[in-house]
Design a protein with these regions (language model features):
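Generic detector of contiguous secondary-structure segments
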Residues: 25, 31-34
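An extended, acidic
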Residues: 33-161
């Protein structure tokens, strides 16, 4: 209920109270927080490159997205797995991330980390159906919005739904 923890204690049986809950998203005991960057200028982004046959049709659109971002950021990286890229966003190592052609298991855990760390996650249209649609945008509030705005003009019709 509103992300609060409720506990029912039976003091009559002298049971100890439960331990305090761990932070929502943590690394080595420290709470994860998305970066505080305010724009894409100087941002470090993560992405994945289309590689399956059914994604190659969208390669030109992807490259247009890439071109529109590479000049205004500090760089674009690929860690090797979408889940790891999303964890980097949650830890503030990346300011934002985008990719398409993913499966639910590629995104679910990392998306939860980003949300727990104070970030935003959506599909390319800004809705919360990224698990169903297989494409994702994630980041801190400012970079997320700027990334979404920058890539949307380059979306093929199949990804605008």
């Amino acid at each position: 209920i509103n992300r609060k923890r409720f506990v029912a204690l039976d003091r009559g049986h002298k049971e100890p109270p439960p331990p305090p809950p761990p932070p929502p998203a943590a690394l080595n005991g420290r709470r994860l927080r998305v970066s505080g960057r305010k724009s894409l200028e100087g941002a470090l982004l993560g992405t994945g490159f289309p590689f399956r046959d059914n994604q190659i049709d969208n390669l030109d659109n992807y490259l247009n997205m890439f071109r529109s971002l590479v000049g205004q950021t500090a760089g674009i990286r690929r860690a090797g797995a979408a889940s790891l890229d999303l964890a980097y966003v949650a830890a503030g190592r990346y300011d934002a991330f985008w990719e398409f052609g993913l499966s639910e298991w590629d995104m679910a855990a990392g998306a939860l980390l980003v949300q727990e760390a104070g970030g935003l996650v959506s599909d390319f249209t800004g809705s919360h159906e990224f698990l169903e649609k297989g494409h994702i945008v994630a980041g801190n509030t400012k970079c997320f919005k700027a990334l979404l705005t920058t890539i949307q003009p380059h979306l093929p019709p199949s990804l605008k739904r």
